[in-house]
Amino acid sequence: MSQREKKNQEAVYESESEFIEKLVAIKRTAKVVKGGSRFNFSAIVVVGDGKGSVGYGLGKAKEVPEAIRKATDQAQKQMIKVEIKDGRTIFHETIGRFGAGNVVLRPASAGTGIIAGGSMRPIFEAIGISDVLAKSTGTSNPHNLIKATFAALQNISPPKRVAAKRGLAAKNVRIRD
């Protein structure tokens, strides 16, 4: 098999993935050496299945496609499961913090859409949430915003889990919207 056929086969394989892949950021770094500058690239990728599983990854390489591939592989290994209410929003308001990044997530009524800025929107698109209100304060650094958003998503507790912790029936637990 020639190099060209291998390349084409890999491209087809990547496009047939069952995951939704969203590129969040690409950054170029420069190392100054005696002969000039050497450039490296870092990429942040969010991967989700559209049904409640999502992960993020950071890849670094000398070329952009290789950095994206590394980030995608890492994201697929670090996926978390998030409970989604009615297949479209989150159960309750939650706060996530990481570094200087603060994120507030609120459930939204049907038809609202994803009202989120910066690096948060690709996460909600990949996870399968279609109605949510999100606000970020502090930093606009994509690394910290993604980690803060994941911290907020991990704080979400569906009524069944809350009922089990309290020793109640699930129908007796009411989560305020």
From Swiss-Prot:
PROSITE patterns: S5_DSRBD (PS50881). One of its GO terms (biological process) is translation. GO terms for cellular component: small ribosomal subunit. GO terms for molecular function: rRNA binding; structural constituent of ribosome. InterPro entries: Ribosomal_Su5_D2-typ_SF (IPR020568), Ribosomal_uS5 (IPR000851), Ribosomal_uS5_bac-type (IPR005712), Ribosomal_uS5_C (IPR005324), Ribosomal_uS5_N (IPR013810), Ribsml_uS5_D2-typ_fold_subgr (IPR014721). Belongs to the universal ribosomal protein uS5 family. NCBIfam families: rpsE_bact. HAMAP family: Ribosomal_uS5_B (MF_01307_B). Part of the 30S ribosomal subunit. Contacts proteins S4 and S8. With S4 and S12 plays an important role in translational accuracy. This is Small ribosomal subunit protein uS5. It comes from Magnetococcus marinus (strain ATCC BAA-1437 / JCM 17883 / MC-1). The lineage of its organism: Bacteria, Pseudomonadati, Pseudomonadota, Alphaproteobacteria, Magnetococcales.
